[in-house]
Amino acid sequence: MLVTLAKVEVSAFCNRTARAKNPLQQFDDLTSYMALYGLAHYQRMRTIIDYVQVMPHFKITQPIEACVIDYGCGQGIASLAFIDHLIESKLQIKCLKLVLIEPSAHALKRAIYWIEKKAKAAEINIEVIALACTFDELEPDYLASNINQYPCFHLFNNILDMYSAGIFSLSKLTQLIKMQPNENFIFAVSPDFSSGNRGFDALHEFTRPNTIYLNTTGTIEVEEYRYTSQKTSMRKAPVRVYAAKL
């Protein structure tokens, strides 16, 4: 009975939110998303950040002063993964500016809550700038007005598949990114499937980066909640990853 009920609830969630492609507007949907997908998306982003930042040709000045731009941040999964990497790597952090871009005001509020709790617990100086809008609604100076001269880390976590659906203009967005004279790093990750891959290919074509750290597909171990068994379990998950410096 519980398994049947769980299947019905998951099916209703997927139908109501277009498999979470629509901005989440209900508290229960935010919770369902995190339960179903949150941990796996966190692990994918942590994998790419952890891998790239130990590469010998990747350098970041300490104490760290940086700006993190989380595109389609949802509930802040990618930002939390980035912060956790810095903490667990025992890197000195002077100041982090987080620009959260998310059309759902409810998800954005939840992201701010989790990030501020993390910052307080770790005693990190973090400034959060929340932009409740779509990518196409961003002001041309959304970066210049927020980032000072900090290196910028642009995080695309499970979002590039929406490019294929025509939900936003990746060409326009990358032009805004490239206008900034700062150091710009891109970290993008998603489950490996065809529509998502088109977004990754377009991102590479539009940005024409100077340095490519990663641009590949692969498989990683992720822990996921399985509604059929009502518990978490490990599985091999296909991923598409992209990391570059413009």
Q: What are these model-derived regions, one by one?
A:
Residues 197-246:
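Class I S-adenosyl-L-methionine
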Residues 75-92:
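Conserved SAM-binding loop of SAM-dependent methyltransferases across substrates and taxa
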Residues 1-17:
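N-terminal auxiliary segments of SAM/dcSAM-dependent transferases
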Residues 104:
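Conserved SAM/SAH-binding beta-strand->alpha-helix loop
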Residues 109-148:
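S-adenosyl-L-methionine
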Residues 19-59:
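Class I SAM-dependent methyltransferase Rossmann-like catalytic core
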Residues 181-192:
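Conserved beta-strand signature within the Rossmann-like core of class I S-adenosyl-L-methionine
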Residues 150-166:
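A short SAM/SAH-binding and catalytic strip from SAM-dependent methyltransferases
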